[in-house]
Amino acid sequence: MYPVDLHMHTVASTHAYSTLSDYIAEAKRKGIKLFAITDHGPDMEDAPHHWHFINMRIWPRLVDGVGILRGIEANIKNINGEIDCSGKMFDSLDLIIAGFHEPVFAPHDKETNTQAMIATIASGKVHIISHPGNPKYPVEVNAIAQAAAKHHVALEINNSSFLHSRKGSEDNCRAVAAAVRDAGGWVALGSDSHTAFTLGDFTECRKILDAVNFPEDRILNVSPQRLLAFLESRGMAPVPEFAEL
């Protein structure tokens, strides 16, 4: 459906079950050209140590024609927008996703959740907000979308939210997609795979986008070139190996 997947977890997050090699093989089989490994930030109970993220610098950029982005799904820690990604971790990572997770930031009222999310968006440290339609964390959707558009941060539509977790996300995610459309922002699609078998599956995301007539030219996953141009506009150095994608 789309050749880029921006959200997945490996065995380094111990509630996930596939390796980097598993994802590469599945990407090659499915025609995925570029993906990002985004294991949970170290403040989560079963997350990898921060050295795991720093040492991603040893990964090859391209394997069997598949591009690999070094990423993290960091945790929003407080209303100041702090995340559990810092220091040398930033030097090794291409893609910073951040979102709410109950073990790190418990659900609050709409005003508090919105304050924390907007502070994270405005921090300049994050490229994508993960699953902002989670019904456990109500937010002021229009305010979030406007802040994201202003700061060039994408809001995610997460396929797993409609299948395995965060049940009841459909209405919120339609509202998120519509608000991003109206604000002229970016949407990022993530399979949120915890096994390689679901890599690149955006079936439920597509239903949400179609329901609000979301413009294709504001979806980051449409091509590797679009996603890389977005990241480079946010300060990522061009990766020569990705030129052939």
UniProtKB/Swiss-Prot annotation:
GO terms for biological process: bacterial-type flagellum-dependent swarming motility. SUPFAM superfamilies: PHP domain-like. The keyword Hydrolase applies. It comes from the Bacteria. Pfam families: PHP. The keyword Metal-binding applies. Zn(2+) 2 binds at residues 15, 40, 194. Zn(2+) 3 binds at residues 73, 101, 131. GO terms for cellular component: cytosol. Its EC number is 3.1.3.-. Disulfide bonds: none annotated. Zn(2+) 1 binds at residues 7, 9, 73, 192. Keywords: Hydrolase, Metal-binding, Zinc. One of its GO terms (molecular function) is phosphatase activity. InterPro entries: Phosphatase_YcdX_put, PHP_dom, PHP_phosphatase, Pol/His_phosphatase_N, Pol/histidinol_Pase-like. Homotrimer. This is Probable phosphatase YcdX. It comes from Salmonella schwarzengrund (strain CVM19633). The lineage of its organism: Bacteria, Pseudomonadati, Pseudomonadota, Gammaproteobacteria, Enterobacterales. The gene is ycdX.
